[in-house]
């Protein structure tokens, strides 16, 4: 009799929970419609994988890419709508969040074509790879719209877990296994530190978890200048630091870049920074409104260390992927300038514009590395010598992307940095901008060193890898070259038509 009553109570409770979830999706599901499209794509992938054989691989790529494109379309149709807070305050939809969601979807859409030939050559499981990429994208999108501490913690964990699995996807590679272990341990430690900071915020605000309610709670409890808030600020900055990977929280980055599969590195190098930047902007700007001077100082220190150490250490690298790892550390220092400037002086607009260009520059570079690695089997910078004599298109594409990363005019990277530094200068960040200019000049040195190797025609300098260089006969080659071409064009053309891009960013945000 007791068991029967308990069973009935369980059924009633389950029914109530299901009905509440259905009610939320029915009346507030429009706020997460792009995310729902990705979830539908994930379910469809699983269904097709369980009922088909390996001959249906093209369908897996088609479903993944189509769900991403439809999600982007749904996001664009919702552009410039009024801000919406849904799901009992857990999720917020506004122009600022949607821009970052668009950038994450764009990254994933460009990364999938980079993976086609690599997966075929390495014989990796295609379905699981695409599932992890789409799930990580989903976690990044939810993180951009997260409006409470619980969602801000769960969403990046969804992204991080998929990132750990992707970085160790080539299980037979010892370097990949080592990279995964370091990434997992560092990520777990950073998450625990982040939660520790959240607990101080939660307690100091009187038990509030929504970002704006935390501010009101701190005012009511008069704890906004307490030591607990300082502890929360330091803990959250450290936790977010491991996600953004500025110096000195960059220890995992070079090893993960070098050991992980190259398409995975391309994906992580941009999506993780976009999602973490969106999260850092909201967490620091809203709950720590009364401690703006303190977190500005912390971020200034991180930006200076990142720009100097990242570019100095990149000079000494012999591996292309390790060089790009240290270069990305320097790049995040530039992005932090936009976070510090904030709403005033178009700081956010300059940061978003530079991130858009960084996506095209970085993914274009990685597309070239994927092609060269598949055709030669090496990642050593020295082995790129003389590539222009064998494959002029690949060599020129890589050279353009590297020059754009360095910030040479009239490429997109130059105008992105110019706008970012100009906004920083107007906000009074003279030291940061000066260091940014000097380190940008320094970065041009090691990029030009690689370009010099690419263009060399001396036989004694050309390595056996380039002498035996052969184009791959696989048709899937076209998808990598298509993605590479799109990124190269995006890295050069926007420099000529900069004003419309800036106008769109400013009009959307303000």
From Swiss-Prot:
Function: NDH shuttles electrons from NAD(P)H:plastoquinone, via FMN and iron-sulfur (Fe-S) centers, to quinones in the photosynthetic chain and possibly in a chloroplast respiratory chain. The immediate electron acceptor for the enzyme in this species is believed to be plastoquinone. Couples the redox reaction to proton translocation, and thus conserves the redox energy in a proton gradient.
Main localization, broad class: plastid
HAMAP family with a match to the protein in the record: NDH1_NuoN_1
Example GO molecular function: quinone binding
Quaternary assembly: NDH is composed of at least 16 different subunits, 5 of which are encoded in the nucleus.
Source domain of life: Eukaryota
Protein's recorded name: NAD(P)H-quinone oxidoreductase subunit 2 A, chloroplastic
UniProt record similarity statement: Belongs to the complex I subunit 2 family.
This enzyme's EC code(s): 7.1.1.-
Organism in which the protein naturally occurs: Agrostis stolonifera (Creeping bentgrass)
Pfam families recorded: Ndh2_N, Proton_antipo_M
Catalytic activity: a plastoquinone + NADH + (n+1) H(+)(in) = a plastoquinol + NAD(+) + n H(+)(out); a plastoquinone + NADPH + (n+1) H(+)(in) = a plastoquinol + NADP(+) + n H(+)(out)
């Amino acid at each position: 009799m007791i068991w029967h009553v308990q069973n009935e109570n369980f059924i009633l409770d389950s029914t109530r929970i299901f009905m509440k979830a259905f009610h939320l999706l029915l009346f507030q599901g429009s706020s997460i419609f792009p995310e729902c499209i990705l979830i539908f794509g994930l379910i469809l992938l699983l269904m097709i994988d369980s009922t088909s054989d390996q001959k249906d691989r093209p369908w897996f790529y088609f479903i993944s890419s189509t769900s991403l494109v439809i999600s982007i379309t749904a996001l664009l149709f919702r552009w410039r709508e009024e801000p919406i807070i849904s799901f009992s305050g857990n999720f917020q939809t506004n122009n600022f969040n949607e821009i970052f969601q668009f950038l994450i979807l764009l990254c994933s859409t460009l990364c999938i074509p980079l993976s086609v030939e690599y997966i075929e050559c390495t014989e990796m499981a295609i379905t699981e790879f695409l599932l992890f990429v789409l799930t990580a994208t989903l976690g990044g999108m939810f993180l951009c719209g997260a409006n409470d501490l619980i969602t801000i913690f769960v969403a990046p964990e969804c992204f991080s877990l998929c990132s750990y699995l992707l970085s160790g996807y080539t299980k037979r590679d010892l370097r990949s296994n080592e990279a995964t272990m370091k990434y997992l341990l560092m990520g777990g430690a950073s998450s625990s530190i982040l939660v520790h900071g959240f607990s101080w915020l939660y307690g100091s605000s009187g038990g509030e978890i929504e970002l704006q309610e935390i501010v009101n709670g701190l005012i009511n409890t008069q704890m906004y200048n307490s030591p607990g808030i300082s502890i929360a600020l330091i803990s959250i900055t450290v936790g977010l630091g491991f996600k953004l990977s500025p110096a000195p929280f960059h220890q995992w980055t070079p090893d993960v870049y070098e050991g992980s599969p190259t398409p995975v590195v391309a994906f992580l190098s941009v999506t993780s920074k976009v999602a973490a930047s969106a999260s850092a902007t909201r967490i620091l700007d809203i709950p720590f409104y009364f401690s703006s001077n303190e977190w500005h100082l912390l971020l200034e220190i991180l930006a200076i260390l990142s720009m100097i150490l990242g570019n100095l250490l990149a000079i000494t690298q012999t591996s292309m992927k390790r060089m790009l790892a240290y270069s990305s550390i320097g790049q995040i220092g530039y992005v932090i300038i936009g976070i510090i400037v904030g709403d005033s002086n178009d700081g956010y607009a300059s940061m978003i514009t530079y991130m858009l260009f960084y996506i095209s520059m970085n993914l274009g570079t990685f597309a070239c590395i994927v092609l060269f690695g598949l055709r030669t089997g090496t990642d050593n910078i020295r082995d790129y010598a003389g590539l222009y004599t064998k494959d002029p298109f690949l060599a020129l594409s890589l050279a353009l992307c590297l020059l754009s990363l360095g910030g040479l005019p009239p490429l997109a990277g130059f105008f992105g940095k110019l706008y970012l530094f100009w906004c920083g200068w107007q906000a009074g960040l003279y030291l940061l901008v000066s260091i940014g200019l000097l380190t940008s000049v320094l970065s041009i040195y090691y990029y030009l060193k690689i370009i010099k190797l690419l263009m060399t025609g001396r036989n004694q300098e050309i390595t056996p890898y380039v002498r035996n260089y052969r184009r791959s006969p696989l048709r899937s080659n076209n998808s990598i070259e298509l993605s590479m071409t799109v990124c190269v064009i995006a890295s050069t053309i926007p420099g000529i038509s900069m004003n419309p891009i800036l106008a769109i960013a400013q009009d959307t945000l303000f």
